[in-house]
A protein has these predicted regions:
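Short beta-strand-to-loop capping motifs
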Residues: 5-8, 47, 64-68
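Intrinsically disordered, low-complexity regulatory segments enriched in Ser/Thr/Pro
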Residues: 52-76
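Intrinsically disordered, low-complexity regulatory regions enriched in serine/threonine/proline
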Residues: 4, 72-118
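Terminal, regulation- and interaction-focused segments at domain boundaries
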Residues: 1-18, 22
């Protein structure tokens, strides 16, 4: 069953994403709106059959949605203790909005818009 960790400090939230990407997790969705990383942000990472979703707002900080076992591993690796609660950035409708506003990553990578592979 998936759980949602809430109120994660921005620096910790960003460092978890960076560490997972360095560990081989692949970005399968990313919010590319003009306010990405300023007001709101969304990332979806996958490795094998595992999936982790990250939501962030500058008002409510970071959120992470994943299986309990994955969240426990993240707590151990990053020496933190997550709080769990009602999400703001990772509500189903908000995620759908992020995904709708995002270009598929294969398009970005195919045309290499940012001069690097994402």
């Amino acid at each position: 069953m998936k759980k949602i960790a809430t109120d994660i400090e921005t620096e910790v939230w960003a460092s978890i994403i960076k560490a997972l990407r360095n560990d081989g997790w692949i970005v399968t969705a990313k919010y590319w709106g003009f306010d990405a990383g300023i007001d709101d942000d969304y990332w979806c990472l996958r490795r094998g059959l595992d999936k982790i979703e990250f939501g962030w707002s500058n008002w409510t900080e970071g959120e992470i949605k994943a299986k309990r076992s994955i969240l426990e591993k993240l707590e151990e690796k990053h020496k933190i203790k997550f709080k769990f609660g009602e999400p703001m950035s990772l509500k189903k409708l908000v995620i759908a909005t992020y995904k709708f506003q995002s270009l598929p990553l294969w398009i970005l990578n195919k045309f290499n818009f940012f001069d690097r592979k994402l």
